[in-house]
Amino acid sequence: LDVKKDWSDHALWWEKKKTWLLKTHWTLDKYGIQADAKLQFTPQHKLLRLQLPNMKYVKVKVNFSDRVFKAVSDICKTFNIRHPEELSLLRKPRDPSKKKKKKLDDQCEDDAFELEGPLITPGSGNIYSSPGLYSKTMTPTYDAHDGSPLSPTSAWFGDSALSEGNPGILAVSQPVTSPESLAKMYKPQALLDKAKINQGWLDSSRSLMEQEVKENEALLLRFKYYSFFDLNPKYDAIRINQLYEQSKWAILLEEIECTEEEMMMFAALQYHINKLSIMSSENHLNNSDKDVDEVDAALLDLEITLEGGKTSTILGDITSIPELADYIKVFKPKKLTLKGYKPYWCTFKDTSISCYKSKEESNGTPAHQMNLRGCEVTPDVNISGQKFNIKLLIPVAEGMNEIWLRCDNETQYASWMAACRLASKGKTMADSSYGMEVQNILSFLKMQHLNPDPQLIPEQINTDINPECLVSPRYLKKYKNKQITARILEAHQNVAQMSLIEAKMRFIQAWQSLPEFGITHFIARFQGGKKEELIGIAYNRLIRMDASTGDAVKTWRFSNMKQWNVNWEIKMVTVEFADDVRVSFICTEVDCKVVHEFIGGYIFLSTRAKDQNESLDEEMFYKLTSGWV
């Protein structure tokens, strides 16, 4: 047949062995292929339906023969998302409470969230800035005030149909369309349900075809690792928006716990962001060539970048380490006593707190002393009730000692909470991040304050609020819509002056401040244990947790880790720490490879530095996460 076709994208796929025959210099005999083997000559690039963190679907053509890590990098490059190593692909979780539906029903549900337009192909067109890189000479691609694109749209979406109409659709927040759509979504009811969701993470070291992903299958693109490097409004409008969306949905679907005051603060920020997103879209339709004051943009960038670089203009004596000393109420709940909090004169030096019965006795021997290195620090705050508690779980040989500290006011709480958080990481108050940590805590508390003059809230804006789309179902059951609306509008007064990007960054910061933030749960059985427990993995530690309450039983820091390995035959993960501490567990609901990849992935992310201008070291990632390279 005289048919002209480009076969360059095709390759041989061996279905029986689940492998691609990509080494064209190898003979079939070297691959071990016999005469009865069935080989499929198929395109390597196939369509995939990706659900983005904002819950919208977009069709993408992805290389099914690339390892997932490389495929995700290509997808992020197309979407202009820097640091693709933080994201990965996840299979859609099934709601166990619902009966099995027909595929057609699922498709109809998904179509309600379909983005208009485009098929986006990784690699098509020029990419404006190379994701995964950091460079001081990078040209800003977004307005640091509202996140709108500064570049010609074709520069970062190529010839894609996304460059028509609204080019910044991926950088624009999508409000929840209706309470009904929110109600249909799967909400994990317990910690075990949250742990089961993590069964769905794909293996980053194997290709999509090897993991039986089909063409046109729906997968979720999510931030997998909760370590967000160099979030910068000038380059990361899409990344920041998708991160905001992921955090927003985590709160609305109750995947992470928050207090009532925090929920109203999150709702107020959402309301503010939704309003500004509409205004920003309208402004840029009318004024697409708006000039940006580079000095203002740089100052704003310094103000609200989550990580890095702020140094105090007042330099104290660099040889001295700051200390805290004040009366603090201390409580040990595990002691068999009816006594409550007892006031002590407490001094915080280095990473230790010493408690004295009075200020006058502070030169003598302390009544209690605790080293906070490696401890778990959890806030317990109620602004309206003036409750400012710090819960400490301090590691000891037999488990964790629980200590509660009660502060008198916000200022005292912020200073001591910041010191506790740094001490848990082995840092002192001399660390440059201490002042910023104190300010972040105070800012977080300030956003939760009730407005003393609710009558100042204009009546006319009450009508454009839909509380059913701004708070989680738990609070909808607890209060009437009118009550929730009033509280959201009160909380909105604390954030009303923020710019669009600042509001998103504040939302992400507040999400990061929640006690449960950044912990990925897995169901596990520990060596010597008789029942199923939870293993929690965070960016800097492993946590053994009670499966019913979520309380930490024991914590181990990665900074003390010597090595970890997997016995692939019995599916056991073993982690060795300093002082001959050895932790072994079997994952009961998930392949141990997923847990191994989380540990190795966080170690890989901890090696990143701002002065690196080279691209990602893929081979290093595979060495740390694949287990067999």
Residue ranges of model-derived segments:
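Short, contiguous acidic and Ser/Thr-rich linear segments
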Residues: 1, 52-70, 239, 405-410
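Short amphipathic, charge-patterned alpha-helical segments
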Residues: 1-4, 64-84, 161, 167, ...
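N-terminal recruitment modules of adaptor/scaffold proteins
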Residues: 2, 20, 25, 53-55, ...
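Eukaryotic mixed-charge, acidic/polar low-complexity intrinsically disordered regions
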Residues: 3-11, 15-41, 94-213
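Conserved, structured regulatory domains from eukaryotic proteins
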Residues: 21, 43-48, 98-122, 180-208, ...
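Eukaryote-biased recognition of intrinsically disordered, low-complexity regulatory segments
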Residues: 37-61, 220-223
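Canonical phosphoinositide-binding patch of PH/PH-like domains
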Residues: 60-61, 397-415, 580-600
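Short aromatic-glycine-enriched beta-strand elements
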Residues: 386-391, 571-574
